[in-house]
């Protein structure tokens, strides 16, 4: 009996930088947009993420989530959540995931900058 190795999934975000800084104002603008709005997000190196907001949900007061279908990566979904505490700036977290891809992009706040970083999906736990 031979244990089969799961084949590694292809990396579909290879043309994007490993780390990109995203403008907070641009990310916050996404949460002021409505469903079916076309959006674009500027990344380091002059790269752009383009897509359409497919869903916007207020999960509870101070927590809003949006889903964006990325037009340049069919099947990829950019899920973003904004967490707002009274008297503080909102904190945005997110991830871009594709079920057939081996790579994931994770958005997090580090040292007052929003970073979109590439990670291997097999090391990434979905929440």
Regions flagged by a language model, labelled:
Residues 1-127:
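N-terminal prosegments of processed precursors
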């Amino acid at each position: 009996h031979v244990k089969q190795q799961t084949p590694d999934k292809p990396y579909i975000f290879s043309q994007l930088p490993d780390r990109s800084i995203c403008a907070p104002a641009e990310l916050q603008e996404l949460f002021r947009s409505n469903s079916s709005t076309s959006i674009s997000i500027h990344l380091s190196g002059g790269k752009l993420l383009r897509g359409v907001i497919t869903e916007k949900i207020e999960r509870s007061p101070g927590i809003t989530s949006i889903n964006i279908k990325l037009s340049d990566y069919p099947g990829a979904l950019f899920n973003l959540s904004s967490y707002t505490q009274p008297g503080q700036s909102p904190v945005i977290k997110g991830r871009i995931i594709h079920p057939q891809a081996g790579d994931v992009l994770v958005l997090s706040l580090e040292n007052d900058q929003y970073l979109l970083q590439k990670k291997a999906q097999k090391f990434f736990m979905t929440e």
